[in-house]
């Protein structure tokens, strides 16, 4: 009976380690990508998409676009849809931005008129949790977000996490023998 408790504890530790080191890559806008909203009633599609996802420190946002750009700006610049000194400017058709801190990130298109038409987005990154309240779920996304696999991709923050987990399991198994 004591051996079973050790195995269960080891499995819990393994899941906890993976939850700490895994991050998610999101495709901005989901299946639609980083595009100009097609009509005025879609002007908030990016913020609606962002509000349906849970972003953590270490996650990344991939912006895919053609003949466009993406800028990371301040809140004031976001509201005005203009900037002279963006934190990031990219027009390479495929831009990946790492969410490196908790808080708000403001994104706008750098093409004249696109931001005013709704090609802008606010992403809220969650505070880092110091201790888990319960075992981590299999995914931090709502079930509806799993419909399109190309919009969200799990990745690993570092390769060592797998080795740590395997080591814990091997040590546990050999300690029971």
UniProtKB/Swiss-Prot annotation:
Subcellular location: Cell membrane
Tissues/organs with expression: Confined to flowers.
Purpose of the protein: May act as a carbohydrate transporter.
Keywords: Cell membrane, Disulfide bond, Glycoprotein, GPI-anchor, Lipoprotein, Membrane, Signal
InterPro entries, alphabetized: Cupredoxin (IPR008972), ENL_dom (IPR041846), Phytocyanin-like (IPR039391), Phytocyanin_dom (IPR003245)
Species assigned in the record: Arabidopsis thaliana
Matches recorded under SUPFAM superfamilies: Cupredoxins
GO cellular component: a single term: plasma membrane
Membrane topology listed for this record: Lipid-anchor; GPI-anchor
Principal localisation: membrane
Lineage: Eukaryota, Viridiplantae, Streptophyta, Embryophyta, Tracheophyta
Entry's family note: Belongs to the early nodulin-like (ENODL) family.
Domain Phytocyanin: from-to ranges: 24-127
Gene: ENODL6
Glycosylation sites: 41
One Pfam entry name: Cu_bind_like
Leader peptide range in chain numbering: 1-23
UniProt propeptide residues: 150-177
Disulfide-bonded cysteines: 81-115
Name used for this protein in its record: Early nodulin-like protein 6
GO MF terms held by the record: electron transfer activity
PANTHER family: BLUE COPPER PROTEIN, EARLY NODULIN-LIKE PROTEIN 5-RELATED
GPI-anchor amidated asparagine lipid sites: 149
């Amino acid at each position: 009976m004591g051996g079973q408790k050790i195995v269960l504890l080891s499995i819990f530790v393994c899941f906890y380690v993976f939850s700490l080191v895994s991050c998610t890559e999101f495709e901005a806008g989901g299946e639609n990508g980083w595009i100009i909203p097609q009509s005025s009633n879609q002007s908030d599609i990016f913020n609606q998409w962002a509000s349906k996802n849970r972003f953590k420190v270490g996650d990344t946002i991939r912006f895919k676009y053609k003949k466009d750009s993406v800028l990371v700006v301040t809140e004031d610049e976001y509201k005005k849809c203009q900037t002279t000194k963006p934190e990031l400017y990219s027009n390479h058709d495929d831009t990946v931005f790492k969410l490196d801190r908790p808080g708000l990130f403001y994104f706008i298109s750098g093409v004249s008129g696109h931001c005013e038409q709704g090609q802008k987005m606010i992403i809220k990154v969650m505070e880092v949790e110091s201790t888990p309240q319960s075992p981590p779920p299999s995914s931090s996304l709502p079930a509806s977000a799993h419909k399109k696999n190309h919009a969200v991709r799990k990745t690993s923050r570092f390769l060592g996490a797998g080795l740590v987990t395997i080591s814990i399991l091997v040590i546990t198994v050999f300690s029971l023998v």
